[in-house]
Amino acid sequence: MKIILSPAKKMIVDTDNLVPVELPVYIDKTAEVLNWIKSKSKEELKAIWKCNDKIAEQNFNRLENMDLYNRLTPAVLAYEGIAFQYMAPSVFENSQFEYVQNHLRILSAFYGVLKPMDGVTPYRLEMQAKVEIGDAKNLYEYWNDMLYRSVIDESRIIINLASKEYSKCIEKYLTPKDKYITISFCEQAGNKLVTKGTYAKMARGEMVRFMAENDIENPDDIKKFDRLGYIFRSDLSSDSKYVFERKIA
């Protein structure tokens, strides 16, 4: 069973704590992406990154000294977004690190697929960015089915905790043999259920922590998740979609 999760824009360098286990599986493809990015001007990169001048300058400076092989941070500690804050890997026990290393895969526009203990360096690139490398018209074409092939295992079970921008990389290549379960976090707004981005990100990270703490191997056990005020809604769920509703006091 594999769990897929989106990356975060905000990243840090932490070379003082855990040492990465290995390099990302598609590091050669990442080097190709990096060369393409380095060939662009500041203004072109600002448009690709869709950011203000300050963030563009910060990332442009990063590019000049970017090293894919040295001073790396384990991926699960490098990302600082909401989902990763609620996953709280910095306080994982050894068994929980082992669980996420075996089961969690972080999808990335720059690296393709990351195991939690793969060594990474901070970057800025989203899957929807207007990037044309070689014959590929965009990053979805560039990565093709590589993300799916890296994620699928002998169980053929994938738990989707990723955003649509990233889950698309997997969904296009699913086969009838695969069991693909999307986890949906929602809450009542008026007379309908809606997904609120910040709460959903919090819940995705908390779900990974819940699965790691409970060593979950059977998708049915995911339904026991009851953190952050969420409860499983069996009446709204199916074999391919688990719906959790946040009860607002």
UniProtKB/Swiss-Prot annotation:
Any GO BP annotation: response to hydroperoxide
GO cellular component: cytosol
Superkingdom as given in the UniProt entry: Bacteria
InterPro entries, sorted: YaaA
Similarity comment text for this entry: Belongs to the UPF0246 family.
NCBIfam families attached to this UniProt entry: PRK02101.1-4
Protein name per UniProt: UPF0246 protein EUBREC_1226
Species for this entry: Agathobacter rectalis (strain ATCC 33656 / DSM 3377 / JCM 17463 / KCTC 5835 / VPI 0990)
